[in-house]
């Protein structure tokens, strides 16, 4: 695989951006953060590190290590989904309860937008597993998942830029569209094997639209009324099963004899 041979350096560059973006709201008060936020942070960080390690291992032809690390998706991806689900419920609960002005204004919309990313991420990984014999498509689907984490990171960093308007909506829209532009550019480099990037570009454009047009109150109320840990457990188990069917495709119990 030569097309994405340096992708791991770009992935690793996201980690310090995450630290800067989430320092005020999470890392600076990590001791008082909720379990939901800890699981969410752990799942996201582990996934980025795994994606970087997978890119590096295959670029340096460490095929045995690449295959061994590949099995970690059955732990890290369900953890990512479980953490994302817990964070969604927490965000929705704050939005419904209007615990603070930010949650009251944006919590329901953000929960709706983030829910689509939590759903899309394991679907992209499943596509990567299902096409693991096609190196470029496999890599593109894996790398596309990393672009899903960019919008919330960029939305927290853009307001610190000189001259950027002091608007959370503008920061969110700019973050979404910047990530979509990156995904679209990567897709244009390879419109066949890189179709996962087109999916992410379309998703992030859709997220920009629903953030602006859909208040998300019904979604927030539904999430807030759902017990978080049973929901997160069910989501993690469903994710594991979905990945396993791509890793070990089901074979028919009865084989049809060839025509004579």
Q: Which role fits each region the language model picked out?
A:
Residues 1-260:
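Alpha-helical membrane insertion/targeting regions
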């Amino acid at each position: 695989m030569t097309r994405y041979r340096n992708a791991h350096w770009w992935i690793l560059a996201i980690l310090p951006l995450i630290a800067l973006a989430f320092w005020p709201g999470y890392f600076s008060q990590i001791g008082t953060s909720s379990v939901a936020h800890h699981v969410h942070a752990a799942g996201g960080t582990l996934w980025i590190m795994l994606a970087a390690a997978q890119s590096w291992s295959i670029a340096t032809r460490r095929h045995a290590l690449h295959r061994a690390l590949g099995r970690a998706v059955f732990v890290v991806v369900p953890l990512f989904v479980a953490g994302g689900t817990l964070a969604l419920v927490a965000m929705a609960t704050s939005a419904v309860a209007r615990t603070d002005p930010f949650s009251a204004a944006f919590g329901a919309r953000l929960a709706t937008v983030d829910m689509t990313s939590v759903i899309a991420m394991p679907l992209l990984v499943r596509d990567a597993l299902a096409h693991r014999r096609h190196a470029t498509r496999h890599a593109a689907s894996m790398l596309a998942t990393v672009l899903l984490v960019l919008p919330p990171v960029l939305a927290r960093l853009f307001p610190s830029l000189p001259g950027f308007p002091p608007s959370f909506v503008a920061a969110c829209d700019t973050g979404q569209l910047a990530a979509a532009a990156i995904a679209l550019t990567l897709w244009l480099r390879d419109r066949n094997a890189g179709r996962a990037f087109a999916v992410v570009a379309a998703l992030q454009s859709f997220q920009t639209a629903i953030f602006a047009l859909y208040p998300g109150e019904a979604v927030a109320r539904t999430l807030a009324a759902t017990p978080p840990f049973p929901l997160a457990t069910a989501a993690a188990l469903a994710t594991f099963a979905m990945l396993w069917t791509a890793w070990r495709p089901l074979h028919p119990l009865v084989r049809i004899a060839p025509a004579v």
